[in-house]
Amino acid sequence: MRALGGDRLPLCKSCMEGTRQTILQEIENKVKSADSHNVIWIRGPPGVGKSALAASISTRLEGKGRHVISFRFDRTQSTTITTDALWRVIACDFVRQYPSLRQHLVEGSRGHNSSDIDHLFKSLIETPLSALDNVPHEELPVIVVDALDECGGLRHDSSGWDDYEGLLHTLKRWVQVDHLKKFKLVITSRPENRITQIFPDSISTHVNIPSGSDVKPGDSASNDIRVFLKSQLDAMGVDEAWVVRAIDHLVPRAGGIFIWATTVADFLRLNPKVRFSALELKDDSDGLETLYSLYSTVITTLFGRGLREEEIKAVTSVMGAMTFAKQPLDDDALIKLPRVKSRDMLEFI
């Protein structure tokens, strides 16, 4: 079966202990229910912790005896972490769990043209899995695919788009083919329109991770940020009263964006009280806006106040773009950022 395998990346780090309990229980309940939709889509903007949720639900299910097949896309490795690799990895894992499928997969893989993703899916997934009709729902593997929207990389060329469209086209079969409907598929991504077209909420379960103005004081998303920040600030050796005041100031500004909270914790770690005084954040409800404000504060604090305002804005824009892209960006991409404006500014950065 080795020839059938594809490249695979491990899932990211799980959620911190004690956080995301409400949403994890919701996902687990949907996975266990034979009557709910077979596709569970965890949706949210960058930085809210979708990948951590994918890792946590995998660990949680495996800890309760459920076999999980996981796969993670990464836009920086779009030439190897492909749709072809996804279905080959899943096929191989099914064979390890159900050796009787081996012959189906070996025969289906013969003469396969990697450009024909529909044939690959039918021969390695759709047809073989029909042999598992008699397996009880609670014993079937759960498939977890993280960062679905990163398939195809930045999609600057036709190959990236072709791979992404091939992925969506084959995934659509998951809700169309009767015998595939018994297999639970958990996916994570940003709320992209193309994915919504494939998986509208009429045929899939949408688990929306709130952010910005959707995060209210006292709700689970806000409390999760609070738990995370308290654990980080407590470890810095400062007095409890200061920790409480700092958390009360920071939590509303996070807007449910975990990458914001992580950046704050990293920034404060070396000199908490002094650096906290530099966090003159705007009172925005949108976590993404406060993230840019935070970057600006970090840059000013770390590099001194000799930078001009336009330079701070440009550096902040570049840092933000690379954070959300999760990879280095080339000059051609960065020059298009509105705050960079010129080659001279880009060279300065």
Regions found by a protein language model. Name each.
Residues 1-349:
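Conserved NB-ARC/NACHT P-loop NTPase core of NLR-like innate immune receptors
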